């Protein structure tokens, strides 16, 4: 039996749309205003640095022959579909987990757009301490990490705490 979308976790997909819009817009701005590998210091531990990543997190598999572009695109699509099915099976009142899934979906689709349109993921957030730089990342990566952290957090909640977090009152 079909249930109304508004009563399912899919009601929270608007958050994924917001993530995709913010991610793509921020990357477009960086690509329009920066040359590749150009870096602009903003504060003592943070630069905007335009970089491209042909792999996954921490440039995993970036040095391969190009097959990884399609491999990671397939993973992004697969994860997004699985999470949307999970959202459909949940209720709209399960806010925490559905927001977590929406953040992950939005991040995955933002990076998927880059892979399909640009052939690589465009990164620009560059945090560092002295001469050590954390791998450059983007807003999609931030959304994925926050979403994953929320999934883990939700897993530690007791059933009573889950009801309190998801209570509409």
From Swiss-Prot:
The keyword Cell inner membrane applies. PROSITE patterns: SPASE_II (PS00855). The keyword Cell inner membrane applies. It is found in: Cell inner membrane. The chain crosses the membrane at residues 4-24, 29-49, 70-90, 101-121, 137-157. Keywords: Aspartyl protease, Cell inner membrane, Cell membrane, Hydrolase, Membrane, Protease, Transmembrane, Transmembrane helix. GO terms for cellular component: plasma membrane. Pfam families: Peptidase_A8. The active site is at residues 123, 141. It is an enzyme of class 3 (hydrolase). One of its GO terms (molecular function) is endopeptidase activity. It catalyses: Release of signal peptides from bacterial membrane prolipoproteins. Hydrolyzes -Xaa-Yaa-Zaa-|-(S,diacylglyceryl)Cys-, in which Xaa is hydrophobic (preferably Leu), and Yaa (Ala or Ser) and Zaa (Gly or Ala) have small, neutral side chains. Pathway: Protein modification; lipoprotein biosynthesis (signal peptide cleavage). Its EC number is 3.4.23.36. It is a multi-pass membrane protein. It comes from the Bacteria. GO terms for biological process: proteolysis. Belongs to the peptidase A8 family. This protein specifically catalyzes the removal of signal peptides from prolipoproteins. PANTHER family: LIPOPROTEIN SIGNAL PEPTIDASE (PTHR33695:SF1). This is Lipoprotein signal peptidase. It comes from Yersinia pestis.
